[in-house]
Amino acid sequence: MEIFVGTDIMEVERIKKILEKRPHFLERIFTEKEREFLRKKKNPWPHLAGFFSAKESVSKVLGTGIRGFSWQDIEIIHNEYGKPEVVLKGKAKAIAAEKGIKEIKLSISHTSDYAMSVAIAVGGENS
C-alpha cells in the first residue's frame, strides 16, 4: 500500500490576472459543471482559485503534474453537504487505475486572498 499526497496554494489575485490576460482560460481548465458552480457564486474568485488549487493537488497525487492528460480530466464537484469531491476522467482516471487509486479525498480552504487544497489517496497492492 502507498499513500499519495498533493497540496497547493493559489493567490486569488493571480487567478484574476490570468483570466484578464487569457479569457479562454476558464473554458480550457474548468468543466461545464465547475463553471456552473462558479456562476452561482456572488464572489467566484476564491472558489475559482480553490478549484485550480485542487486540480493541482490532484495532479500531484497522480505523480504527473498536468502532463499526459487534460485539466478537464480532473473535475471538482460538491456533494449534497457541500463537501468537495474529485471525479477523474480520461487519462487521469487511467493513471489513477495504474497506481491502484480508487478514490481521492480532497479538502479546499480559501480566504479573500488565498486558496489552498490537499488531496490524499491510497493505492498500490491491496489498497
From Swiss-Prot:
Keyword field: Cytoplasm, Fatty acid biosynthesis, Fatty acid metabolism, Lipid biosynthesis, Lipid metabolism, Magnesium, Metal-binding, Transferase
Cofactor(s) listed in the protein's UniProt record: Mg(2+)
GO CC terms, sorted: cytosol
Enzyme class: transferase
Superkingdom in the source lineage: Bacteria
Reaction it catalyzes: apo-[ACP] + CoA = holo-[ACP] + adenosine 3',5'-bisphosphate + H(+)
NCBIfam families, per the entry: acpS (TIGR00516), pantethn_trn (TIGR00556)
Protein name (Swiss-Prot/TrEMBL): Holo-[acyl-carrier-protein] synthase
